[in-house]
Amino acid sequence: MNGTEFIAQILKQEGVNEMTCFPSNALIEEAAKTGIRPVMFRHERGAIMAADGYSRMSDGKRFGVVAMQHAGGAENSVGGLSQAFGDNVPILVLPGGYPLERRNVRPNFLANENWKGVVKSVEVIHTPTQIKDVMRRAFQALRNGNGGPVVVEMTLDVC
């Protein structure tokens, strides 16, 4: 089992039935295999806004989940994240991330560094052994306290 398979299983166990997304992110295929319906968008912000609307309509019982590619895909998401943060809307955001060996090469976009001011919580999965605990903390953050976007960046060589 690889990292994206494990994350998809956790999402399903947490009751996720739909996931908005923008290609290309390996989690999209793995989530579909577990029965999570991917809803594809033509722009990252649209996917985030749909996840935001899903969370708003479900009264805190379910959360919008969105997956997108790393780099430009993650960069295009900041507007939607800022809106969800400003309105205290809990959404789970799962961007891809650069492979560990290239994470600190400039000008790579690192979600965990760039989104700190517009999200409730942000973590990066560096090793497969972190997946269970990082995802547990992500869902705890979604369920507790003020709402807001929770980000789990999935490095390409781990997930």
Question: What are these model-derived regions, one by one?
Answer:
Residues 1-159:
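N-terminal alpha/beta PP-like core and its mobile active-site loop of ThDP/TPP-dependent enzymes
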